[in-house]
């Protein structure tokens, strides 16, 4: 499962966090991204900008994790501001978002990303996900994509069945 994965860079301001994703946003980096966003939400950040200007490709697992946060953070909250915005996704990533029925979950921005001067840069550490964590994240991501767009059920039915069986086998192996 060793595959080049995304580099994540975080810039935080007083009321937002910007996560820059460089390289390949794939299944291998999905648990790190999910953990990062959850940690930032726990710290009180509710507005996220995901900078995709250097993201060359995104797979369905990463997109499913992104969609999970799109559903949670962009739910109507009366504030009028989306909780998560995508900045400068390339054509390939935009087409994937559209083809899998997830583009509507996000506000997309294009052009130069201008951030306030008072941002702090931090580089998150990897959680070094186990095979089980990657499998669970991938399963949940594909289930989300199936829930977002009924057309995805046919696309991911076999994948989710395989992942569920794999996860079950991994959990059995852990039992004493």
Predicted regions located by residue number:
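Short amphipathic alpha-helical segments, especially helix-boundary/capping motifs
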Residues: 10-14, 44-47, 70, 118
